[in-house]
């Protein structure tokens, strides 16, 4: 038995929040497979080490990217521990609702909420045209995560429902491709606008 194998046996399996395994998480969308990082980590906190590398975001664990999106608006900026606890509690709620590994549910939600095409403005002869373009995989993931957290935030704002429950519900709805999900609605809206400007 090699030294590496004995070390792995002593440490045990690395699990997210010490509960959910990274094994057998399937990414069905081939374009997103390379960019959804499911590398096992004890704590999803890289400290921005990816910042100065090109496409470094692709190496950041997907749960950390979700946590970073949860602490998005001004009053929550910098409160990563608060965002960490929100995601942790929402993952527990997802597990209670679905009975599945919350990581798998999150990956499915990202696949369903990631738009495939959008519009961009092109100036031609002094006139601005909106033209439909394909979206890069990293941007697809960024938009999906942004819409998931935005939907949870809107659902919890001025409402008795907590942000943890709202995030869990939004991820679960997006994973089942439910049109009641804010992220799925935004995806369909973006794709509809892109289709009309082809």
From Swiss-Prot:
The keyword Chloroplast does not apply. CDD domains: uS7_Eukaryote. One of its GO terms (biological process) is translation. Gene3D superfamilies: Ribosomal protein S7 domain. GO terms for molecular function: rRNA binding; structural constituent of ribosome. InterPro entries: Ribosomal_uS7, Ribosomal_uS7_arc, Ribosomal_uS7_CS, Ribosomal_uS7_dom, Ribosomal_uS7_dom_sf, Ribosomal_uS7_euk/arc. Belongs to the universal ribosomal protein uS7 family. HAMAP family: Ribosomal_uS7_A. This is Small ribosomal subunit protein uS7. It comes from Desulfurococcus amylolyticus (strain DSM 18924 / JCM 16383 / VKM B-2413 / 1221n) (Desulfurococcus kamchatkensis). The lineage of its organism: Archaea, Thermoproteota, Thermoprotei, Desulfurococcales, Desulfurococcaceae.
């Amino acid at each position: 038995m090699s030294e590496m194998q004995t070390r792995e046996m002593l440490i045990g399996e690395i699990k997210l929040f010490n509960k959910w395994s990274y094994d057998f998480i399937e990414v069905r969308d081939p374009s997103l497979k390379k960019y959804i990082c499911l590398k096992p980590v004890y704590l999803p906190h890289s400290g921005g080490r990816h910042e100065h590398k090109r496409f470094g975001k692709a190496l950041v664990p997907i749960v950390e990217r979700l946590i970073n999106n949860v602490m998005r608006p001004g009053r929550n900026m910098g409160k990563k521990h608060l965002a960490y606890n929100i995601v942790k509690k929402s993952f527990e709620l997802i597990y209670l609702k679905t009975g599945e590994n919350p990581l798998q549910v999150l990956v499915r939600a990202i696949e369903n909420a990631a738009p495939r095409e959008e519009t961009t403005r092109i100036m031609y002869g002094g006139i601005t045209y909106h033209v439909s373009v394909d979206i890069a995989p990293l941007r697809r993931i960024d938009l999906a995560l942004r819409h998931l957290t935005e939907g949870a935030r809107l659902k919890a704002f001025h409402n008795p429902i907590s942000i943890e429950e709202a995030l869990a519900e939004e991820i679960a709805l997006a994973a089942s491709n439910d049109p009641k999900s804010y992220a799925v609605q935004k995806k369909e809206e973006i794709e509809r606008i892109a289709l009309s400007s082809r």
